[in-house]
Design a protein with these regions (language model features):
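Short catalytic-loop micro-motif centered on adjacent basic/acidic residues
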Residues: 347-350
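A short glycine-rich, hydrophobically flanked beta-strand micro-motif that places a catalytic Asp/Glu
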Residues: 353-354
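C-terminal motif of bacterial Sec signal peptides marking the signal peptidase cleavage site
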Residues: 15-17
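Bacterial N-terminal signal peptides that target proteins for export
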Residues: 1-7
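Short secondary-structure subsegments characteristic of cysteine-rich extracellular domains
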Residues: 11-12, 201
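Bacterial signal peptide processing site
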Residues: 19-21
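Secreted, cysteine-rich disulfide-bonded mini-domains of extracellular proteins
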Residues: 582-670
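N-terminal hydrophobic targeting/anchoring segments and the immediately downstream early-domain regions
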Residues: 29-327, 332-339, 343, 358, ...
């Protein structure tokens, strides 16, 4: 099947680099800035995709921890845990499709684990992404709040606590789009005893709306915004403006969508994602995760062989073309929905749309004098690693051009992923998955795509966040272990230094650390002016949706996608490191107390590991030179640990134990 022009244009733009395809309409007018009413700019930055009330998503059966009250430690997934696990008998779900017996999921680890094993084992697999320990299934080492969770790799524990949101607000957050979320398939995979009610995405949304209203009523520093003017008033009074949005696959269920849209508008919703993880009555979804391909398969039992997205030679559930793109665009209902959203002056979020659905939506909004669209959370395709860039869900420069032309904004995912080097920035991409990687995408967006950006963190979104640059909790770990160790060691030497907050070792663990990510980005050398003022940009987009428009907001003729370095595969990079017992390692990358596998990894050249590194140990001192000037390397019960030298009169056995370097015959320091 042939892809439509938008998809072809995006690929051509990628190949042409600094000469992207010009999609400007010949007769399109660009608005004169002088004709646009200029208001006093609000202060602060925006977060465009925040799941504050996701504890009630999936019928309340997945997350531990409330957005309000006191944060408490969890049971660590010990049976029968009330969170972070799927059922044991998920293989029965496949029986819904008579052709499921022909499926070979052995080459799709996440699905093989999920449907073949289930329970705690599958839950742990879902939560363990390379470079992490995970916090799902049996997670006894991730029980304690504040020390073991939340962390950057948390996907089943609260990251949107109201105290954390208050912390973010005090740090400069002035607008947050609260995404009311659920997913029926994930709900159906959870243990029945953990569900508070029958699985229904829109019911979950209504529960979360009520939670948002309750939060608004009892909170002096935050308020739900119902219009851009209202948001300006809220921010001017020193409060956080919250904008309600909906993100579900079964939008409005099977009910009359017009009456439902009116009802949810009256409940305070002002932003809509027409599609989410699955195709629905309104349009096609972008493919990206095998779990949701399985979910789509369970709805239609379709196995596509035009392209192998799910596994070798096959794609589950979605009808794809030879380029692995969903062929479904906006349906007749979807086109009518977009028209109604524009009539109401609501915000249209393109996130998760298939490329064809984006194309169809753009055609409608362009025809309405460039009605603004935005992407609440996304990745810039051209700067991501090849595996991620291959996902339809990533955003190509051709779509960014239209976001700019429409006067929209892009919510940049604060992701844990590898990025390619962007050579137009002096910020070294020397800590994969950390702020340094985020900086490559941000600078590409700022300098190359020149698109207005805000944060699109997706906290509580079943997804991981920016990794730390320091500490032992997955610093720089988006690549492979040896590289992570080498890069983490480099951060200690080359800096910039730690911020002195939890962000240093836990990464973007919760919403309260967004200001710290911004600070770290700034101290790395990025120009963060636009990001720091992104709330004003968001409000101008919203105002544009409700104002008379005369043409494009921006011709966007200056996009430059060049400057992105060629990606070097992990296997090629790993081959540059020495090996012991067949395992690559970074020489002298570990300091005292760090976890290690081999002596050669430690600066002290001494590691307590066993069995060729299969049983890890710790780096210990092997002599006084490994310790500080006022310390010595201990012996006996203190073997391998640096001890403070002793004052005069203290018991000693050797001269090196004494500050005076003199242990007398009385076994006391002189």
């Amino acid at each position: 099947m042939n892809r439509r022009p938008l998809a072809l244009l995006s690929m051509l733009a990628l190949m042409q680099g600094c000469n992207p395809v010009d999609e400007t309409q010949p007769d399109a007018l660009v608005e004169d800035p002088a004709t646009v009413e200029q208001k006093v700019a609000v202060s602060g930055f925006a977060e465009l995709h925040h799941h504050m009330f996701a504890e009630e998503a999936f019928s309340g059966g997945w997350f531990h921890g409330s957005h309000t009250g006191t944060m408490v430690s969890c049971d660590g997934g010990a049976p029968e845990s009330d969170h972070a696990r799927v059922r044991m008998d998920l293989s029965n779900m496949l029986n819904l499709c008579p052709n499921s017996g022909a499926l070979d999921l052995s080459g799709v680890p996440v699905l093989n684990s999920m449907f073949g094993v289930g329970g705690a084992v599958a839950s742990e697999f879902i939560g363990k992404i390379e470079g992490t320990e995970g916090d799902t299934g049996l997670h006894l080492g991730r029980k304690q709040v504040n020390t073991q969770w939340p962390r950057w790799d948390t996907i089943a524990h609260q990251q949107a606590f109201e105290g954390s949101l208050r912390q973010a607000h005090l740090g400069g957050l002035s607008i947050v789009t609260v995404s009311l979320v659920s997913n029926g398939f994930l709900c159906s995979a959870l243990p029945y005893q953990n569900l508070k009610r029958p699985c229904d995405e829109m019911t979950d949304v209504e529960v979360q709306i009520q939670m948002a209203k309750d939060f608004d009523a009892r909170t002096a520093w935050a308020e739900i915004a119902l219009s851009p003017a209202h948001a300006r008033q809220i921010i001017a009074s020193g409060k956080l403006a919250m904008v309600l949005s909906i993100e579900v696959s079964k939008l409005f269920g099977t009910k009359d969508w017009r009456s439902e849209l009116n009802r949810f508008y009256n409940l305070g919703v002002r932003s809509i994602q027409p599609v989410h993880q699955l195709d629905n009555r309104f349009g096609g979804a972008a493919l990206h995760n095998a779990i949701f391909q399985a979910a789509q398969f369970l709805e239609n039992c379709h196995i596509d062989t035009d392209c192998g997205v799910t596994g070798p030679g096959f794609t589950l559930g979605f009808d794809v073309d030879a380029n692995c793109r969903n062929v479904k665009g906006l349906t007749a209902e979807g086109k009518a929905l977009v028209q109604e959203l524009m009539a109401k002056g609501m915000l249209i979020d393109l996130a998760h749309m298939s490329e064809r659905t984006v194309e169809d939506t753009v055609a409608l909004t362009r025809g309405n004098t460039y009605y603004p669209v935005y992407i609440s959370h996304g990745h810039f395709r051209e700067v991501m690693s090849p595996d991620l860039a291959a996902n339809e869900k990533t955003t190509p420069a051709s779509v960014i051009r239209y976001v700019r032309q429409s006067g929209g904004i892009f919510g940049l995912r604060t992701a844990h992923d590898e990025t390619r080097d962007y050579t137009r920035t002096p910020i070294a991409n020397s800590c994969q998955g950390s702020t340094r990687s985020f900086a490559q995408a941000y600078e590409f967006g700022r300098q190359g795509l020149k698109v207005p950006m805000a944060f699109g963190a997706d906290l509580n979104g079943f997804i991981q966040q920016t990794r730390p640059r320091f500490g032992s909790y997955g610093a720089c770990s988006a690549g492979f272990k040896a590289e992570a160790d080498a890069q983490a060691a480099q951060q200690r030497v080359s800096g910039p230094p730690r911020l002195g907050t939890d962000f240093d070792q836990y990464g973007l663990a919760h919403v309260g650390l967004l200001p710290d990510l911004l600070r770290d980005l700034k101290q790395l050398g990025a120009n963060t002016t636009g990001l720091e003022g992104s709330s004003e940009t968001f409000l101008r987009m919203w105002e544009r949706a409700q104002s008379t428009r005369t043409g494009m907001a921006d011709a966007a003729a200056d996009i430059d996608t060049s400057g992105v370095a060629t990606y070097v595969p992990k296997a090629t990079r790993e081959a540059q490191y020495p090996q012991i017992c067949g395992k690559a390692y970074a020489p002298s990358s570990k300091v005292l107390g760090d976890t290690c596998r081999f002596n050669e990894e430690c600066v002290s050249a001494k590691c307590t590991s066993l069995d060729c590194g299969n049983i890890t140990g710790s780096c210990i001192c092997d002599g006084d030179n490994d310790c500080g000037a006022q310390q010595y390397c201990g012996w006996g019960l203190n073997t391998g640990t640096c001890q403070n030298k002793k004052a005069k009169g203290a018991l000693c056995s050797n001269n090196n134990e004494c500050l005076s370097n003199n242990c007398r015959w009385t076994y006391t320091c002189g």
